[in-house]
Amino acid sequence: MLEKSLATLFALLILATLINRFLLWRLPERKGGEVTLRIRTWWGIVICFSMVISGPRWMTLTFFALISFLALKEYCTLISVHFPRWLYWGIPLNYLLIGFNCFELFLLFIPWAGFLILATGQVLVGDPSGFLHTVSAIFWGWIMTVFALSHAAWLLMLPTTNIQGGALLVLFLLALTESNDIAQYLWGKSCGRRKVVPKVSPGKTLEGLMGGVITIMIASLIIGPLLTPLNTLQALLAGLLIGISGFCGDVVMSAIKRDIGVKDSGKLLPGHGGLLDRIDSLIFTAPVFFYFIRYCCY
C-alpha cells in the first residue's frame, strides 16, 4: 500500500508538470515562472520524502529531527533574541525518546524540563533585561518546531504489527495537510468574499476555509480507510480536525511573520519561501491528528 500511495504522488506530480507545460505552450504570455519553480521544488520534496519514508524507522526519525533542526534554526534567524546553541542538543534527545517509545518522558521533556532549564539558563546569564521576551520567544520556537512537529514522527511508533502502518499514517497526515493548504487557496481564489483575519492574512476567506475543510473531509473519507485504521465517521472527523487545525497553523505563522515584519520565513525552498512557510500547517495538524488517532484506535 505504501508503494502504491507513493506512486500516486508521483503520478499527480507528473500530471501537474504536464499541465503546467501545456499552459506555458498554449499561453506564452502567461507568467508561469513561479508555478514552475514550485513544481520543481515539490519534485525534490516528494523524492526525498519517498526515500526516507520507505527506509528503516531510524532513517525517518533522523529526517524529522533534521527538519526540526532546520525549522528551529530558521525561526532563530527571524526573532531578535540570542538563542543558546546548547539548546539544539535537545533535538536529538527528543527524537531518541520517540525512537525508544518513551511517551511519558516525551510529554515532560520539552514542555516542563525544557522550560525550567531554559528559564534558569537565562537567569544565570545575569542580564535580566528582556528576560520575558527572550524566554517566551525561544520557548515558543521550541514548542512549534520540535515538540509539536515531532508528533508526526510519533505516528511511526503507534502500530505494533504492521511496520508500514506508521509510515502510512505519516503519509495520510502529510497528504491531507498539504492538500488542505492547496484546497483552501483555490476555494478562496475562486469564490472567496468574506475575510476571516484581514489584519493577519488578508487572503484568507471564510469561503476558502469552508471549501477547503469540506474538500479534506471528502478526501479523508476516501483514503482514510485505505491508509489508516479509522472507520467512516472517524475519517470524517479526522478530515475536519486537519482542515481546521491546518488553517490555524497557517494564520498563526502569518501572525508571527507579520509581527516580525517579513513576508517569508526564509529562502530554503524555491517558490515556497522558507521551511516554516511549508510546515506551518503541519505544526498544528501533527499533534491534533496524533492524539485523535491514538485515542480512537490505540
Region spans (language model):
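A short, conserved beta-to-alpha structural element at the edge of catalytic cores
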Residues: 281-282, 297
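Juxtamembrane boundary at the C-terminal end of a transmembrane helix
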Residues: 291-298
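Membrane-embedded alpha-helical bundles of polytopic integral membrane proteins
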Residues: 1-241
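Hydrophobic alpha-helical transmembrane segments of membrane transport and translocation systems
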Residues: 283, 288-291
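Interfacial loop-to-transmembrane junctions
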Residues: 259-281
